[in-house]
Curated annotation (Swiss-Prot):
Gene: kefF
Chief location: membrane
Superkingdom of the source species: Bacteria
Residues that hold FMN according to the record: 8, 14-17, 65-68, 105-108
InterPro entries, sorted: Flavodoxin_fold (IPR003680), Flavoprotein-like_sf (IPR029039), K_H_efflux_KefF (IPR023948), KefG/KefF (IPR046980)
Keywords per UniProt: Cell inner membrane, Cell membrane, Flavoprotein, FMN, Membrane, NAD, Oxidoreductase
Pfam family, one: Flavodoxin_2
Name assigned to this protein: Glutathione-regulated potassium-efflux system ancillary protein KefF
């Protein structure tokens, strides 16, 4: 099962993430958990989140990039849900062998994230990749949708279909 942990503080403003979720939602065995919908008060149900993670083979962290990082509720979710003795540390093997995909949208162009005056995309992904590896997850190459503020609808739809194809390809390889 694919579990999408979706974190967008203003989901009604995001045409890109909306289209990505619509495309992903057409696949079988996909569960979408919208953190800002489930936890508007930031009071995360750790047991429910850990149960959802336990059912998944592929975990997707989908969100807009905010200040070169994750939105605050996703960071809190990581702090609360990925606990010692469950996700890492002595006895913390619940996530071992599962895959993790970082699916991120950005307002800037892909060239904005080239090494130079701004941090490169590989550099920006390092904290998430390190978290994944620490928890025994298999890190997959990220999926990024760039220029989402200026893309026309056809471009957003095409990129959202690429996202769906990426998930479908994972399903075909891993679950035949």
């Amino acid at each position: 099962m694919i579990l999408i942990i979706y974190a967008h503080p203003y989901p009604h403003h995001s045409h890109a993430n909306k289209r990505m979720l619509e495309q992903a939602g057409t696949l079988e065995n996909v569960e979408i958990r919208s953190l800002y919908h489930l936890y508007p008060d930031f009071n995360i149900d750790v047991a429910a989140e850990q149960e959802a993670l336990s059912r998944a083979s592929l975990i997707v962290w989908q969100h807009p990039m905010q200040w070169y990082s994750v939105p605050p509720l996703l960071k809190l979710w990581m702090d609360k849900v990925l606990t010692h003795g469950w996700a890492y540390g002595h006895g913390g093997t619940a996530l071992h062998g599962k895959h993790l995909l970082w699916a991120v949208t950005t307002g800037g162009g892909e060239n904005h994230f080239a090494i130079g005056s701004h941090p490169g995309f590989d550099v920006l992904s390092q904290p998430l990749q390190a978290t994944a590896l620490y928890c025994g997850l298999k890190w997959l190459p990220p999926f990024a949708m760039h220029c989402t503020f200026i893309c026309d609808d056809d471009t957003l739809q095409a990129q959202a279909r690429q996202y769906k194809q990426r998930l479908l390809a994972w399903q075909e390889v891993n679950h035949g």
